[in-house]
Regions:
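Short, intrinsically disordered, charge-balanced linker/junction segments flanking boundaries
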Residues: 193-195
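Beta1-alpha1 glycine-rich phosphate/pyrophosphate-binding loop at the start
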Residues: 1-5, 34-47, 55-57, 84-92, ...
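Ferredoxin-type iron-sulfur electron-transfer modules and their immediate structural context
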Residues: 1-119
Length: 195
């Protein structure tokens, strides 16, 4: 069980409401994914949770995971303008809240379906492989993913302890990728079992 509690609606809204919508948002520029942080903070503050969910999934292949494990104190939260004397907005906790609230309401990231004749094999079902599969599926490209382990997730599944990242969170994201058209082949060592 994870040791951090998910924000309540009130806590998420009041934290998001602290965002001053900077003209040049340092949180956005410091984020390696260049997430639309001010936009989904504004949507959360206005209680537009479906919009916040869609915005957070637009630039991030798995916001429910990065909200939990990304080192926000050195990235987005570390560069938050409010960090100078007022305390940064708890961006990671809000990101997790947005995802989990969306999932409770039945929201899922949208994929167009396989719309091209292109096929790509992704070797390794760790964070980079899952992100790659996400972007390929968003482009309508069929994905076959191979991993020698018996579960997808790589470091997310085998390296990060469950008290920090519940493994069901990773499994849920993998299921969605499979529903979107990804074929997953675990227990398959590329170069040995297949070539």
């Amino acid at each position: 069980k994870e040791i951090y509690e998910i924000f309540s609606k009130e806590d998420a809204s009041s934290q998001a409401d602290r965002c001053i919508q900077c003209g040049d948002p340092f949180c956005h520029s410091k984020c390696p994914l260049h997430n639309y942080i001010p936009f989904w903070l504004k949507a959360t503050s206005a209680m537009k949770r479906e919009l916040a969910f869609n915005l957070s999934n637009e630039t991030n292949p798995y916001p429910e995971i990065t909200g939990r494990i990304c080192p926000q104190d050195r990235l987005c939260e570390g560069d938050c303008t409010l960090n100078d004397g007022h305390g940064a907005i708890t961006i990671g906790a809000i990101e997790t809240f947005i995802s989990e609230e969306g999932f409770k309401k039945g929201l899922k990231p949208t994929f167009p379906g396989i719309t091209t004749k292109k096929k790509v094999a992704v070797i390794g079902a760790g964070p980079a492989g899952l992100a790659c599969a996400t972007y390929l599926l968003r482009a309508g490209i069929a994905v076959s993913m191979y991993d020698k382990q018996n579960k997808a997730g790589g470091l997310l599944t085998y390296g990060i302890p469950g008290f920090k990242l519940d493994k069901d969170v990773v499994a849920r994201r993998v299921r969605w990728l499979q529903e979107a058209g990804m074929d997953l082949h675990v227990n398959t060592h590329v170069g040995k079992d297949v070539s």
